[in-house]
Amino acid sequence: MSILEVKNLSHGFGDRAIFEDVSFRLLKGEHIGLVGANGEGKSTFMSIVTGKMLPDEGKVEWSKYVTAGYLDQHSVLAERQSVRDVLRTAFDELFKAEARINDLYMEMAEDGADVDALMEEVGELQDRLESRDFYTLDAKIDEVARALGVMDFGMDTDVTSLSGGQRTKVLLAKLLLEKPDILLLDEPTNYLDAEHIDWLKRYLQNYENAFVLISHDIPFLNDVINIVYHVENQQLTRYSGDYYQFQEVYAMKKSQLEAAYERQQKEIADLKDFVARNKARVATRNMAMSRQKKLDKMDIIELQSEKPKPSFDFKPARTPGRFIFQTKNLQIGYDLPLTKPLNLTFERNQKVAIIGANGIGKTTLLKSLLGIISPIAGEVERGDYLELGYFEQEVEGGNRQTPLEAVWNAFPALNQAEVRAALARCGLTTKHIESQIQVLSGGEQAKVRFCLLMNRENNVLVLDEPTNHLDVDAKDELKRALKEYRGSILMVCHDPDFYEGWIDQIWDFNNLT
């Protein structure tokens, strides 16, 4: 029996169709991977099934009494709450039951109280609390918080002071503690370190309820799912098995369709040739008409146009001085120092990856080196002739510009055709280029920012988690481009598969604090 069913769903933004008459079902206990290229509509689908967005057409039907939890990285956390306070809200229902028990005991003390009936209700509530391990909740909260790295930044920390990555960890921990019938997870590993990803993988493998997962971390995705829904060309197609099995079946179906297309095209050409040669001759006119009828009744096989794949190419600028950045007793932070005094040297043509737990100051270090924020103590010496290109991890939402406008405003000397060509090289279609940036997916928005970076000459690239939100093709192409780039790279990255093999040096931020 389906616990979630989507029927005849159609949706779009303006004249850009996202889904066209698609259906979807989720059965109890299924572990579904929702896969597809950037911009195909995966996050939009999640927003529709959770009711955050209304579809243009179609129905979303949930079974009665089913609970669902959605990892929404834009959720608002109440001010003046500690991390522990937020995690304890996962059990609000149980705390209400405890309060009700206390009220019932108060009622028993009143004259004329039906003690037997009140005790029966107390017993039912007590059974519910014990079945949910209510009296060991704090231990359970600590277990999940430790496993996801939440304890690294403190359970008593005010949530309003958290970084984006820390905030996402808290939301994920709260969601897992709630243990709903259906988990809806959109890129849950984006801000997790390797050890936390391993724990989440084991957790999801053993999760007895259902979940729908979006992730561009293919090894992680493959290890936890048993059903794939592929989003492509406004359609949703269901496949049984893990991601690698889906790839095999998809490639085989694509190959079979292409072979059938080629055979049909040859048959069409032969039929048209026969009709053209024989329709005018009396002796063969009937045969020509028969062939024409066959042509007219033929169901034409259509191949979907290939999705544009990005082609990244970062232009080097003139050669800088030997030293890019040198720090002297640098301490970074906002109110309190996040690091011990740092004496770092970053030289010309080095390619360095900065790794370490989320929320401990890697982004703050980049911004301090660039002069975006002032250090608490010490100094940063920047080299001569620097042409810096900076890719930020987080950008503010609500950008009503189109990619065409954003790039053209940044490079007014280009004509419209050149701007469109530059965006197309980053894997964006005409529909993407003419849509507002705020309605694009995270991966598409990243491609717009890469386009801005590519059209400047830089001799230093400073990149903060550049692979977040990128699909497999875009990530592979970015890796190739950075490997071939003839300049210096300083990059924060949590994905060893991305940087291993071409990075010269690793700065482990855990050793700098």
Question: Would you name each region that the model predicts?
Answer:
Residues V249-Q304:
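Intracellular alpha-helical coupling/juxtamembrane segments of multi-pass membrane proteins
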